[in-house]
Regions:
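A glycine/threonine-rich phosphate-anchoring loop and its flanking beta-alpha core
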Residues: 1-54
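Short intrinsically disordered, low-complexity coil segments enriched in acidic
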Residues: 1-8, 99-105, 171
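A broad, structure-centric signal for solvent-exposed, well-ordered loop/edge residues
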Residues: 17-18, 95, 165, 169
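Secondary-structure boundary/capping residues
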Residues: 41, 74, 121, 161-162
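Active-site segments that bind and position negatively charged phosphate/pyrophosphate groups
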Residues: 46-152
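C-terminal charged capping/lid subdomain of soluble metabolic enzymes
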Residues: 142-171
């Protein structure tokens, strides 16, 4: 893996529209973590200008997915390139430096990778991270935001319970 992000990314929306929709689905779950983890991780920091710009950009990751994500999923499942799908692809493809995207949601994913169920059921990274966001928002006492995200997760089938990722509290 490269230590720096690429200078350019070329995205063919036709290819994504014809790929298995579960990859877009998991990508949306992972992308929303950019906003929530950046916000919480940088709360008491004075970030450098490039990090500050990344944090500001991360605020644009959750709202569009909550607004257009359900329609984009339907369009991807129908293999149709639409404005909603194109918008979501754009947001999922953005990035923020690793310093602010390694919060609780991603830490939970890392922990879940040792469970046999993660491998056995082929849970995708963003699928597990999306559940971790709910836990992170609960731990941070952001209940209204958690409930908003919970409703969205339910609307497109992203995990809302440990059982959805085949895990148990005793694991």
């Amino acid at each position: 893996f490269s230590k720096i992000p690429p200078n350019h990314i070329f995205i063919n929306t036709e290819i994504i529209a014809n790929a298995p929709a579960r990859y877009l689905w998991a990508g949306m779950g992972d992308t929303m973590a950019k906003h929530y983890e950046c916000t919480i991780s940088s709360r008491n920091d004075v970030p450098a200008h490039s990090d500050a710009m990344g944090i500001a950009l991360s605020s644009m990751c959750a709202a569009p997915i909550l607004r257009w994500g359900k329609q984009a999923m339907a369009d991807c499942e129908a293999h149709k390139v639409t404005p909603e799908l194109t918008e979501i692809i754009g947001y999922v493809s953005n990035f923020v430096q690793v310093d602010y995207t390694t919060g609780m949601a991603h830490a939970m994913y890392n922990g879940f990778t040792i469970l046999p169920s993660t491998e056995e059921y082929h849970h995708l990274h963003g699928e597990v991270v999306s559940y971790g966001i709910l836990v992170m928002l609960t731990a941070d006492k952001q209940y209204a935001e958690r409930d908003r995200l919970l409703a969205f997760n339910r609307s497109i089938g992203l995990p809302t319970h440990l059982a959805d990722i085949h895990a148990r509290p005793e694991d």
